[in-house]
Amino acid sequence: MTLNKMLFGGGVCAAALLAFSISAEAKRARCFTSDDGYFACTYRAIDDAGSFRISAPGYPTYVLEIDGPGFAYGYVNLGRRNVPLPGQFVRSHDDGACWYNPQTNTKLCAW
């Protein structure tokens, strides 16, 4: 293998690693929950399906795990453990950043 090919291959690997690490980083967002209203938060993608976690100092941490396209189950962490939220969340047709739980009439958004 020539030095140029080795350098090119190493550069491609480094770029792929950088792109992957950036996508997994937490991002600043504006959040809304029915219980807490609007607040500045941190958004972090959890997996490739679209599951995510939102958190902020002084607020509970919320996790939505995608169950299928447009459907998710939620958890809230109030300190030491995740507590399952009742019912299933449905992605909003009006705003794709929002999820609605028709069984509990609650809403969670992250922009």
What do these predicted regions represent?
Residues 25-111:
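Cysteine-centric segments in proteins
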Residues 19-23:
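N-terminal signal peptide c-region/cleavage motif recognized by signal peptidases
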Residues 1-11:
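Bacterial N-terminal signal peptides that target proteins for export
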